[in-house]
Amino acid sequence: MGKSNSKHLLSLGLPILMAATATPAMAQQEPPYWASIDEPEARMRTGPSTEYPTMWIYKRERLPVKILARYKAWRKVEDPDGAQGWMHARLLSATQTAVVVGDKGQVQVLRSKPAADAKVIWRAQPGVVGKITQCENGWCLLDVTGRRGYIAQDAIWGDEPLK
């Protein structure tokens, strides 16, 4: 490989290297803000280090959490049940999700349009997690593994404006 080719490869590699080492956008946000668990198993600890004991082990990928504080690579989080503790930032994603809330057996409906009289197209039990793509006028568009519909904003946790 000649010198001109190696310079060309180096110039292509530098932006890729810079992108790979860049800090995620989520790490730059100021709390409070929303995030979601991004691993099949995530530990909530009593403090911001692996030296602190584990309080909870979450096995719900995409579960929404509220970020309350930051300390280096650690985030103080609150889960849908109100439990607070610390998680490493690599366990979290900036993808905004929500969990359906309500009493056991209380089904929430997803509608075709953001209106109380719109056609019911899906039903979701409390605990179902989906991705939020928009929230307006008391309704959020929720995507649960490709099944999309509008759900009343008070029927989910993980959507309210923060700050």
Language model features by range: what are they?
Residues 25-46, 57-61, 68-71, 75-83, ...:
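SH3-family beta-barrel domains
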Residues 49-52:
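Second-shell loop/turn segments in exported
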Residues 11-21:
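Bacterial N-terminal signal peptides
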Residues 2-13:
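Bacterial N-terminal signal peptides that target proteins for export
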